[in-house]
Amino acid sequence: MTFQFQNEWNPILSDISDSIVDRTAAQWTPATYWGLLEADARAIRPVQQYVCNGPCCSTLWAGPVPGYVITQFVPPVTYPNPYRVVAAPGCAPGSEWCEPPTVSAPPPPSQFSDEPTSPELAPAVPKIDIHEAPVATVSSPTSPRPITTESSRVSPTKEKWGRKRVHKKTHAEATWIPQILKRGMSLSSLLPAAARGQRSAVRRRVTFTNSKDVLYYDKYSAPVMIQGNTVYVEKTFSDK
């Protein structure tokens, strides 16, 4: 689809660097048409168009060529180059009045909209019904009970046939006890007694700040967590 820009049809609008509204005292109503917008001219987008109902019979393509497009017209506006003025639909060169388009203008599209506004130009998109896949169950020839996959479980803690899994506490989980950290206190004094004698108990220096929660973790000692003004150390310590 190509458009011919014929500015010489209307000498009043040929000087597009001046304010069009001030010079013509026209009323502009929006309409839509399809034009090439992108700088590489690869995509088609809806463009805001303004039909003049005054003494000038022309339509303003509100947008530079190529690239950026202005989709709203608020008079008075001074249009710099490279704006273009094209003939309005239903008008002949030199006509006194510009007739409105025969079809009712659709609502103005949003800027850089990807959806076509004209129904005849809109591609027919088939409706696709999306259903959830059924729960997969794999039956084993040796076991009478089917093997349920992870997606078929009702909840992370409740299995399909109603039994509740008990979350067992392992020895690797840390049990934290709070201790108040005073300024100037070393972190090694807060570690368990078994870790104080080790060389690797406080491997690196940790700066205490009130704004952050600091998690201190040493390879051979118990972890220390600083949260606000409180330091949490692990209650149990393993000598591994």
UniProtKB/Swiss-Prot annotation:
Biased composition (Polar residues): 137-155
Region of interest called Disordered, as start-end residue ranges on this chain: 99-121, 136-167
Name of this protein: Uncharacterized protein ORF45
Organism: Ictalurid herpesvirus 1 (strain Auburn) (IcHV-1)
Lineage: Viruses, Duplodnaviria, Heunggongvirae, Peploviricota, Herviviricetes
Recorded name of the encoding gene: ORF45
